[in-house]
Swiss-Prot record:
Record keywords: Cell inner membrane, Cell membrane, Membrane, Transmembrane, Transmembrane helix, Transport
Subcellular location(s) of the protein: Cell inner membrane
InterPro entries the UniProt entry points to: EmrB-like, MFS, MFS_dom, MFS_trans_sf, Multi-R_MdtD
GO CC aspect terms: plasma membrane
Protein name: Putative multidrug resistance protein MdtD
UniProt organism field: Escherichia coli O45:K1 (strain S88 / ExPEC)
Disulfide bonds: none
Chain ranges on the Periplasmic side, renumbered to this chain: 1-11, 70-76, 125-137, 186-196, 246-262, 307-341, 417-430
Cytoplasmic side: 33-48, 98-101, 159-164, 218-224, 284-285, 363-395, 452-471
Keyword Acyltransferase carried by entry: no
Topology with respect to the bilayer: Multi-pass membrane protein
Taxon lineage: Bacteria, Pseudomonadati, Pseudomonadota, Gammaproteobacteria, Enterobacterales
NCBIfam families: efflux_EmrB, PRK10504.1
Main location (coarse class): membrane
Gene: mdtD
Pfam families: MFS_1
């Protein structure tokens, strides 16, 4: 990329900066949840909604982000995304109650939903096609550093300052990013088709109300009748979307996507798989602090080996899949992640704390292999005219399943424990033990989906398919 103009390189730095902000915020909050609960006078069992409100908002808003960027312009939308994210951070820091914090996190989620996909779109427009891969590698590298720094930085700020600072640090960075966006980023627009507002609203309502219903009376305080009503509304909304999308060329997500078997299996496996793995980043620091008495900073440091294992495995995952095939890799990593989850719980409860970093490193390796395999399996056989829609649907499902996973983790804690889990409670470790056993079972379930992947599904299948389509 050395031959790119200076202006283009600065624009890439702005996109990379946005990726870093968004990825840092996904992990920096996890370590601070017990301290937030104490400060706000809430049970730790309710704090999963701090993550759910952000991730669910991202899932709901993702389908609209690309269309808005094409319609209004990438600079305008990227600037708006940074401003909303920064304002959300400010309101999070000023929150005095859990409900105020949840609303502020939702505002952050609107900005986060637009930041990454619009950033990718910007790179496509400002960089020559032959340099696109190198440019995307450059801008996504800070996004990989964010999860590495997030837990430790969050723990450090909580332990030596207060939890408010995990949001306040976004404000000066966001102001600089917003000014740089206005000054340096071009405002590309393009002709767009009419946005499927009806489909968007149906999906948004369906996802939101079903997630709220899943949280149950323990988390939301809704009565059983209200929860049943939410389930009914959510199911009706999703059924109406399916009817709306039939034979509709302008549908938000075409049902033709599901004619590709690997897409259907990959999407179902990704949804179920990320529900299980989505529990781990939330539960691990909570367990370390509340269940084992670790300090916030110590708990944050313990998360670093998991991120390092994930980053290191990305270098060889392609060779692993090509050697053993998608079905074997996905079934093995799914069952392996379940076993590693049990191993983590066992070593922690036995007091073998020096072993935990190695277990978390192994967990990161297994999880990364499974994520990469799920993503490529889902998208690799889609025809070119459906690839963009399929990628958007996968991105939405990834965020939705993570929010459901965190919700289920909070629900499990509520089922096995009282409303006040604390380090001083004699039954706390028992509560966490039953929760982790349940999580290991849920994590293993997608193996049944991945076992249906054809045994001859290798990466070269996608290559040969494209060659045939080009003839």
């Amino acid at each position: 990329m050395t031959d790119l103009p200076d202006s283009t390189r600065w624009q890439l730095w702005i996109v990379a900066f946005g990726f870093f902000m968004q990825s840092l915020d996904t992990t920096i909050v996890n370590t601070a949840l017990p301290s937030m609960a104490q400060s706000l006078g809430e049970s730790p069992l309710h704090m999963h909604m701090v993550i759910v409100s952000y991730v669910l908002t991202v899932a709901v808003m993702l389908p609209a982000s690309g269309w808005l960027a094409d319609k209004v312009g990438v600079r305008n939308i990227f600037f708006t995304a940074i401003v909303l994210f920064t304002l959300g951070s400010l309101f999070c820091a000023l929150s005095g109650t859990l409900n105020e914090l949840l609303l502020a996190r939702a505002l952050q989620g609107v900005g986060g939903a637009m930041m990454v996909p619009v950033g990718r779109l910007t790179v496509m427009k400002i960089v020559p096609r032959e340099q696109y891969m190198a440019a995307m590698t450059f801008v996504t590298l800070p996004g990989q550093v964010g999860p590495l720094l997030g837990p430790a930085l969050g723990g450090l700020l909580v332990e030596y300052a207060s939890w408010h600072w995990i949001f306040l640090i976004n404000i000066p960075v966001g102001i600089i990013g917003a000014i740089a966006t206005l000054m340096l980023m071009p405002n590309y627009t393009m002709q767009t088709r009419r946005f499927d507002l009806s489909g968007f609203l149906l999906l948004a309502v369906g996802m939101a109300v079903l997630t709220l219903a899943l949280d149950g009376s323990k988390g939301t305080g809704f009565s059983p009748l209200a929860i049943a009503g939410l389930v009914a509304v959510g199911v009706v909304a999703l059924v109406l979307y399916l009817l709306h999308a039939q034979n509709n060329n302008r549908a938000l997500f075409s049902l033709k996507l599901f004619r590709t078997r690997t897409f259907s299996l990959g999407l179902a496996g990704s949804f179920a798989g990320r529900i299980g793995s989505g529990m781990l980043p939330f539960m691990t620091p909570v367990f370390l602090q509340i269940g084992l008495g670790f300090s916030p900073f110590h708990a944050g440091l313990m998360m670093i080996p998991m991120v390092l294992g994930s980053m290191g495995m990305k270098r060889i995952v392609v060779q692993v899949v090509n050697r053993f095939g998608y079905r074997r890799v996905l079934v093995a990593t799914t069952l392996g992640l379940s076993l590693v989850t049990l191993l983590f719980m066992t070593t922690a409860l036995l007091g073998w704390y020096y072993v935990l970093p190695f277990v978390l490193f192994l967990q990161g390796m297994v999880n990364s292999t499974r994520f990469s395999s799920m993503n490529t399996l889902t998208l690799k056989d889609l025809p070119d005219n459906l690839a963009s829609s399929g990628n958007s649907l996968l991105s939405m499902i990834m965020q939705l399943s993570m929010s459901i996973g965190v919700t289920i983790a909070g629900l499990l804690l509520g089922l096995f424990g009282s409303q006040h889990v604390s380090v001083d409670s004699g039954t706390t470790q028992t509560v966490f033990m039953y929760t982790w056993l349940s999580m290991a079972f849920i994590i293993a379930l997608p193996a049944f989906v991945f076992a249906r992947v054809p045994s001859d599904t290798h990466q070269n299948v996608a290559i040969s398919r494209r060659k045939r389509s080009a003839q």
